[in-house]
């Protein structure tokens, strides 16, 4: 029997809340953990003191498991790697790089390490480091993306490694969870569907833009420059793509987008802010508590799997 993610992590549901930069605070991670998933603090957009403070706030608000996401290209990644050990964090997910140089210290501290990958070859490369599981994230996801779709990526990662695989990208309801399990994943990581939650600390304008979004309302910026990011279409993202196609240099584009995520998250500027969101935004129709989102996802997945099982007579 395949072990589900909740058995591996000690959570009620086989679901991880994505560690979204400037969004996944200690409070939000605690709310998701208390609702039965694994809450993650997103260290992107934080400095060392802020990360430490968020870990402590999270711990004060939940007695359930939680973790920290570290983007390895963050200028303070080395410092963050030490802080998670000092603060007794039990789980770390990593993105944008190789966590190899931190593994000895993390493993000595008993930390569960789960990297996010966008290709099977990377998962295979990281497995010998002693990782505990891997998140295979498809291009449907919001924020920084790879090229492969979740449906093509997940089974190839499952075949490439011996550790449990968690699916991410384009999953926003029970149908997505059921599909991920059918592809061989042990659970899912979700982000976009949680932006439309009562507890999510983003501006109400950002939530309203998400609820209005349809299936074709996201765009990937930064493909030419090598830092592809999926966001909702708006004035900023269209202008970015126009400048990029016109040959603007990397520094000019960085200046253009400086602070754009904060504009969206904190100021609610839906035209000049970076509204990071995945293609599943079109599935969001109302703002609900995270507890309701997770419970509905698992209940629907069970019904979905039972229904498919009943229909198939091979």
Task: For each feature predicted by the language model, list its residue ranges.
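Active-site entrance/lid segments in N-terminal catalytic domains of soluble metabolic enzymes
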Residues: 1-164
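Conserved active-site-proximal phosphate/metal-binding subdomains
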Residues: 152-166, 172-314
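Residue-level detector of alpha-helix initiation sites
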Residues: 23, 171-172
């Amino acid at each position: 029997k395949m072990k589900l993610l909740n058995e591996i992590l000690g959570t009620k549901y086989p679901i991880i809340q994505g560690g979204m930069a400037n969004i996944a605070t200690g409070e939000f991670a605690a709310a998701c953990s208390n609702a039965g998933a694994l809450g993650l603090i997103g260290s992107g957009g934080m400095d060392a003191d802020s990360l430490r403070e968020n870990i402590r706030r999270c711990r004060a608000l939940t007695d359930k498991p939680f973790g920290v996401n570290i983007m390895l290209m963050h200028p303070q990644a080395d410092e963050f790697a030490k802080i998670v050990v000092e603060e007794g964090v039990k789980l770390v997910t990593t993105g944008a790089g190789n966590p190899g140089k931190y593994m000895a210290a993390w493993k000595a501290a008993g930390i569960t390490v789960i990297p996010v990958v966008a290709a099977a070859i990377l998962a295979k490369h990281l497995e010998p480091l002693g990782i505990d599981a891997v998140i295979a994230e498809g291009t449907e996801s919001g924020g920084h993306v790879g090229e492969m779709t979740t449906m093509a990526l997940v089974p190839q990662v499952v075949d490439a490694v011996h550790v449990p695989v968690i699916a991410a990208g384009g999953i926003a309801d029970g149908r997505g969870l059921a599909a991920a399990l059918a592809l061989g994943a042990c659970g899912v990581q979700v982000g976009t569907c949680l932006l439309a939650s009562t507890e999510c600390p983003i501006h109400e304008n950002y939530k309203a833009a998400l609820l209005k979004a349809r299936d074709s309302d996201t765009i990937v910026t930064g493909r030419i420059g090598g830092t592809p990011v999926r966001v909702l279409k708006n004035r900023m993202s269209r202008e970015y793509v126009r400048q990029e196609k016109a040959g603007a240099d990397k520094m000019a584009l960085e200046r253009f987008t400086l602070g754009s995520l904060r504009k969206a998250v904190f100021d609610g500027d839906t035209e000049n802010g970076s509204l990071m969101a995945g293609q599943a935004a079109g599935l969001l129709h109302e703002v609900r508590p995270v507890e309701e989102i997770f419970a509905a996802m698992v209940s629907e997945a069970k019904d979905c799997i039972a229904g498919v099982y009943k229909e198939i007579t091979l």
